[in-house]
Regions:
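Intrinsically disordered, low-complexity and often Lys/Arg-enriched segments
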Residues: 1-33, 265-290
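Conserved pre-catalytic core of RNA-dependent polymerases
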Residues: 7, 15-240
Length: 356
């Protein structure tokens, strides 16, 4: 893991411990792991310590000095007393009779190496602070339910971990057929109604919080030419909560792919526990040998945000898997897979690029 990423993780943990929030987040994680639903999260989100922790975490990010449509940045918050910061966040979220209304998001086009641009949405700094407050509380709840095969924008996970898992698939497991998937404009096309149901399925049943997340997704977008758009889909890149929401959307894909092979019911039937040194592990090898004699498709997923690969043992499985996954994404997530950019690669004959 790069030292920079490791330092950020350590800093986040140190900040959470300083404000006394780490035990709270740990408890949320374990309660979520036990299948508990959460109906009253707003008091925790708007607690003084969570707000001050959010400020500290945002300040550590260089992007906090980039102004939104109100021309303010983190320095405008830093000059205020802590109690004033906490009171203002609470007022922004709950003070209006119309509920929380985020200010317009500033749209900025970032050049890409291929000559195209990537749209970036920059919320106003106070709205970023609200998003960070929400993220800190719901992230441990979601982490308890996220797939082990997802590596992007998650605590203590990195690009290096995803690449290492990829090498394991190719070199140790001999899964040489790689399906390179491309979802057209993923962040701009996330279905809001579907996302709300997925958040609910995570165990987040606080209706006031879900209403606020809807408002964040519907925040007006101020375009470079000065016009304003009201989005009916998508979660803008640049929003603090957007990567977490993206993982919530695609976690359903992770779990479905795993259910087709890694966590298929036959694995539980034929797998068994065995002791290796001082630990107990669940051995799937016997189950997999039996499953390969059936018509099941052997497939494994490695995902980093919206960039993912599926690994298969032979071309026939790869062709069937490509068709099945494409149909599933279209029907269940209401997203479009690019037929031009999605392809099957035999890595023994051709190169497959993943995460650079």
């Amino acid at each position: 893991m790069p030292k920079k990423n490791k330092t950020l993780c350590v800093d986040d943990l140190r900040h959470a411990e300083y404000y006394g929030m780490q035990p709270v987040f740990d408890e949320l994680y374990h309660r979520s792991l036990e299948g508990e639903n959460f109906t009253d999260l707003m008091d925790l989100i708007l607690s003084r310590d969570n707000i001050l922790l959010a400020y500290r975490n945002i300040k550590a990010n260089g992007g906090s000095y980039t102004a939104g449509t109100d021309n303010k940045n983190i320095s405008d918050i830093g000059c205020l007393p802590p109690e004033t910061v906490a009171e203002k966040v609470r007022f922004i979220v709950t003070g209006s009779q119309h509920g929380y209304r985020p200010k317009p998001v500033r749209r900025k086009d970032i050049p890409k190496p291929n000559g195209k641009t990537r749209p970036l949405g920059i919320p106003c700094i106070w709205d970023r602070l609200v998003q960070q407050c929400i993220k800190q509380v719901i992230e441990p709840i979601c982490e308890a339910k996220f797939s082990d095969n997802s590596y992007g924008f998650r605590p203590n996970r990195s690009v290096e971990h995803a690449v290492q898992k990829t090498y394991t698939m190719l070199q140790r497991m001999n899964l040489h057929y790689v399906i390179e998937f491309d979802i057209k404009g993923f962040f701009d096309n996330v279905n809001h109604s579907k996302l709300m149901r997925q958040i609910w399925a995570m165990g987040i049943h606080d209706k006031q919080l879900i209403f606020i997340i809807k408002r964040i997704l519907k925040a007006p977008i101020r375009m470079p030419d000065g016009t304003t758009l009201i989005p009916d889909k998508g979660t803008p890149q640049g929003g603090i909560i957007s990567p977490l929401l993206a993982n919530i959307v695609l976690n359903e894909l992770d779990k479905w792919v795993e259910s087709q092979w890694q966590n298929h019911p036959l694995v539980k039937e034929y797998g068994y526990e065995r002791k290796i040194r001082n630990s107990i592990t669940f051995d799937r090898s016997k189950a997999f040998l039996k499953m390969r004699k059936t018509g099941l498709k052997e497939m494994y997923i490695v995902r980093y945000a919206d960039d993912f690969r599926i690994f298969c043992r032979n071309k026939e499985d790869a062709l069937r898997t490509k068709e099945a996954v494409t149909a599933w994404i279209t029907e269940r997530l209401r997203l479009e897979v690019s037929p031009e950019k999605t392809r099957i690669v035999n890595v023994r004959k051709r190169y497959s690029e993943f995460l650079g």
